[in-house]
């Protein structure tokens, strides 16, 4: 049985990308060809702008169109004590769930002043979050007064460049507190080239929560509990997936968030004895080696943190030894890692079930 230690690796800190490159598609792309089970994976160093040449006419790229909220606030209690608030999820026009850092947890009814601009009232506790009641439309106040919540491994304060580059060019539905980072590499030129090649596009929405950065703290992976995120698949997406299958094309998830939404919906549909359909739901799906993929054939993804659930996901998809070889190559070749880093193109290995604790 695989354990947390199986997903550890040493990463030189200078390979953690601190800023985005000047051009989105100037990032590097490691194409991983692992389709021959009797041979080591073939690793091809490319530029991301070459992605259209790596996919086929009739394939379908599925993007996550979530938009990152300016979800971080600094503020104070009525006593003057300093607080930090990170919005986790907008739950209504004037309500949201949030993490609150303070010297003492604020009880219900507490008034907090955020960004020296407006007051919110603390409502009920929904572990591990607090309900916040806003005086007006939360999305408007968040966009106007909040700060972009860059990942904890990015060391600079967010600036104007981040406000553009930590969003995808197709972001449309506000609600995430972290970017679907595989999508950050796509610019208009790449999207136009994909269209010219006859590659289809579709979107879904999964609002990425702050839990995406939470470390796994248990050695036995079966004991880990994933955070929950909301997602939505539309009729148009489901129809495009069916049409892609009918013509022999491949479904390519852009990012692990797209992957998780597609696979969660397909797993739940199968459990209910029905075909994949449009849905709006919550998922805490935890994909580890042994998981049987139902929808996704290929995956565009960034390089992930050691011991992270996302590293486990890509290992389940492509095979743990394939991922180890690819990461060793990426480190030796000085690829850039994490949110502002470079990308990989992976192909599903149906024999990648090298452990069985991932479940069906």
Curated annotation (Swiss-Prot):
Protein's GO biological process: queuosine biosynthetic process; tRNA wobble guanine modification
Catalytic reaction equation(s): 7-aminomethyl-7-carbaguanosine(34) in tRNA + S-adenosyl-L-methionine = epoxyqueuosine(34) in tRNA + adenine + L-methionine + 2 H(+)
Broad class of where this protein is predominantly found: cytoplasm
One cellular component term from this protein's GO annotations in UniProt: cytoplasm
Transmembrane region(s): none
Enzyme Commission number: 2.4.99.17
Top EC group: transferase
InterPro entries xrefs: QueA (IPR003699), QueA_dom1 (IPR042118), QueA_dom2 (IPR042119), QueA_sf (IPR036100)
UniProt keyword Cytoplasm present: yes
Pathway it works in: tRNA modification; tRNA-queuosine biosynthesis
Cellular location(s): Cytoplasm
Gene Ontology terms, MF aspect: S-adenosylmethionine:tRNA ribosyltransferase-isomerase activity
Gene3D superfamilies: QueA-like
Keywords assigned by UniProt, alphabetized: Cytoplasm, Queuosine biosynthesis, S-adenosyl-L-methionine, Transferase
Domain of life: Bacteria
SUPFAM superfamilies named among the record's database cross-references: QueA-like (SSF111337)
Protein's UniProt keywords contain Cytoplasm: yes
Subunit note: Monomer.
Family of this protein: Belongs to the QueA family.
Task performed by this protein: Transfers and isomerizes the ribose moiety from AdoMet to the 7-aminomethyl group of 7-deazaguanine (preQ1-tRNA) to give epoxyqueuosine (oQ-tRNA).
Record's protein name: S-adenosylmethionine:tRNA ribosyltransferase-isomerase
Gene: queA
